[in-house]
């Protein structure tokens, strides 16, 4: 009996030996490591300055073709160039064309501050069979965003011109503009923006103060497209003591990617005392 029991024990050990060896030599498989989530791609416009920063898209930064200035500034170490063409037809006859309507905006190292330069533009006017071509005055200024909330943003800018123009296109002296800009988001589709600008104007022999004010309704449409409808007024529009001019503008813009925007516009002034006119324009803006 003892030998038979030993024999059975030996058989049992022999049968279990492979399983025991396998358990000792093969560790349990480790749980797979979680793959890290990919980091978001950097914004091509530049990083936001805060949780409610509205200035993170080209449509928020471009300031043409409306009279109303955009509140937003170009990000530090970036440059934006705006260009355009405008063709004005006057009610009593005559025509004026201006191009390339260039504005160079440079983001400075100080956050929310930019430096602006307006090179001379070509201006061609035709009236009574006579055509005159000249260049406009050069200008420069600074623009700054004062602050923002989830719905409201505001800022200001200063701009000065020097009498560098030719062939009667120049103002004939230095001019200065001091503007306050503001914007308010009504909904994901609708927004309001406005600008109030105090101006020191001249015609070379006289100097006077004027005020330009504007209000624009913005409509965000599908496919990176938007619509702007604006009313603007200009006091002492053509000289000291002259009436206020009113202008209505309708513009459509389309973003071609995050750094290019195209626009087209139509405007009309019905003010007889300052000369009725209407114009068409188009432009392009590039962010680098």
Predicted regions and their residues:
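Bacterial N-terminal signal peptides
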Residues: 5-17
């Amino acid at each position: 009996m003892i030998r038979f029991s030993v024999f059975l024990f030996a058989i049992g050990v022999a049968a279990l030996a492979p399983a025991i060896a396998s358990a000792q030599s093969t560790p349990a498989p480790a749980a797979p490591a979680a793959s890290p989530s990919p980091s978001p791609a950097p914004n091509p416009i530049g990083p936001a300055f805060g949780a409610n920063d509205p200035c993170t898209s080209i449509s928020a930064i471009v300031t043409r073709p409306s009279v109303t200035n955009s509140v937003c500034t170009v990000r530090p170490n970036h440059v934006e160039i705006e260009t355009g063409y405008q063709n004005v037809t006057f009610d009593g006859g005559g025509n004026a064309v201006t191009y390339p309507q260039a504005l160079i905006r440079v983001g400075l190292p100080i956050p929310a501050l930019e430096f602006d330069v307006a090179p001379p533009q070509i201006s061609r006017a035709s009236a009574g069979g006579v055509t005159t071509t000249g260049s406009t005055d050069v200008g420069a200024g600074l623009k700054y965003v004062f602050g923002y909330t989830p719905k409201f943003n505001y800022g200001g800018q200063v701009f000065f011109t020097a009498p560098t123009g030719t062939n009667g296109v120049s103002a004939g002296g230095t001019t200065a503009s001091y503007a306050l800009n503001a914007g308010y988001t009504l909904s994901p589709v609708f927004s309001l923006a406005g600008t109030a600008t105090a101006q020191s104007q001249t015609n070379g022999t006289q100097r006077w103060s004027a005020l330009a004010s504007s209000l624009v309704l913005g409509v965000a449409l599908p496919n990176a497209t938007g619509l702007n409808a604006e009313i603007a007024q200009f006091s002492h529009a053509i000289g000291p003591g002259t009436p206020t001019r009113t202008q209505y503008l309708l513009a459509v813009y389309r973003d071609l990617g995050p750094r290019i925007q195209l626009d087209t516009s139509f405007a009309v002034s019905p003010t007889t005392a300052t000369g009725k006119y209407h114009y068409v324009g188009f432009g392009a803006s590039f962010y680098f």
